[in-house]
Amino acid sequence: MEPNSLRTKVPAFLSDLGKATLRGIRKCPRCGTYNGTRGLSCKNKTCGTIFRYGARKQPSVEAVKIITGSDLQVYSVRQRDRGPDYRCFVELGVSETTIQTVDGTIITQLSSGRCYVPSCLKAATQGVVENQCQHIKLAVNCQAEATPLTLKSSVLNAMQASPETKQTIWQLATEPTGPLVQRITKNILVVKCKASQKHSLGYLHTSFVQKISAKSLPERRFFCSCQTLKSHKSNASKDEVAQRCIHFFACICAFASDETLAQEFSDFLNFDSSGLKEIIVPQLGCHSESTVSACESTASKSKKRRKDEVSGAQRNSSPLPQDAVSSNLRKSGLKKPVVASSLKRQACGQLLDEAQVTLSFQDWLASVTERIHQTMHYQFDGKPEPLVFHIPQSFFDALQQRISIGSAKKRLPNSTTAFVRKDALPLGTFSKYTWHITNILQVKQILDTPEMPLEITRSFIQNRDGTYELFKCPKVEVESIAETYGRIEKQPVLRPLELKTFLKVGNTSPDQKEPTPFIIEWIPDILPQSKIGELRIKFEYGHHRNGHVAEYQDHRPALDQPLELAPLTTITFP
């Protein structure tokens, strides 16, 4: 019997099944691989599309505490009777009550709560419900806290939105009432808003949901409690797209400011009909140079199409065709000068490969340490100006890794502030992250390099004119001659007047209450296209005189003092 007949032969009990169907399987919308309907992700390893997350839910999702930045306790609580995506706000507080007794008046504190579900509010005002509602009970037992999401000013500036929208988002982000966007669950977020009659707490819920179907295109749905439910499908009208609320753009900026979130919500960020490609372009590093090189390698039609796609992203700075022309001019202009420059180099006998000229992170860090050494001079007071460095983002990532040494997780900054620079270049809105180091050993661990170890103290000697210069104690190897000539009494070593400076980090005196910090400030994206940020180092140092702490005294000679010249004499020549 032939092998084909074996394949086509069907058992008798399966002969009446009829035509095969696709029941129980579905096609991946990205790669087209067939997967089971119960599968959580695509079995194609190169695709890795996640269809849905596991049904197992954490108990903390029922109630989540919101970060408000004040004593106000606000909770996001799930409404069990409506569904998993319906949530409400609950406010908890403490009220004082006086009780008159025989012994006197007793003041007690009672915990009070207010649920903002319309039915609960109505029942509370009418006095129908005597006990607490189920939402307040969930908030009282809550132990989970929302996850704050960062927002980068560079992403906000690159977003294709009106200036009023950007200004409103930045004003909400810089208010001291907690983060702008906080994540409650996988799909639900809490966004700050302007307090109104509908949202009296100044917060509202938003949700991002994506439904994948084998028969139709993926359906992306965004819902905000400030408006009615809208389904943003691929065939959504332009009017619906244009009517997005400000809270949608705030969430999109938060997604684009984080690599993990940008990958998770990439379907919303890369949604063609929404014009959101401009938002994610600066975050993923798709600069104009890489876009131009990709366009040059394709046909003219694809080149024109790609220019049209990214022209909106470059509208605020410079149009892409100009960038393409300038880059082409640079490339074409580099061909002839290279020959001339190579001839000049050969004539001079100096051949230097520019590609081999590099600066490692440790070499740069050694220069930072050396500059700190130069700043710790005895001749000046112990409060120098901040040291400013402009470095690439990769250098700061390596420095932040040194800051986090010794801890299991990445050390977060002590403070994060946003500011608007109007009186100096570059202009715009920036974020500043500040770390306070109060352990001198940790400072040394951060700045030590094999080429330049950090010197916590520096020795100086005083000159006759009142100035100071660095004193390096010579290292002399002393031979042991006591065995040959017997014991020799050790004479005390004659040392000059001991003048030292020392880094002030932590508590340097017994009566000091607050430790002196070694401050590291980082402002990313000062040069957004080059990915260059600004690093500021602030520190203080003290003065030692013969082992004792001495107050700084300005011994520098005054510039207006007359120079003492020897009297002129008459010289006679024979």
Curated annotation (Swiss-Prot):
Signal peptide positions (record): none
Region of interest (Disordered), ranges: 297-327
InterPro entries: C2orf42, Zf-tcix
Chain intervals with Polar residues compositional bias: 313-327
Domain of life, per lineage: Eukaryota
Gene Ontology CC: nucleoplasm
Pfam families with a match to the protein in the record: zf-tcix
Stored PANTHER family: C2ORF42 HOMOLOG, PUTATIVE TREBLE-CLEF ZINC-FINGER C2ORF42 FAMILY MEMBER
Protein name: Uncharacterized protein C2orf42 homolog
Species lineage: Eukaryota, Metazoa, Chordata, Craniata, Vertebrata
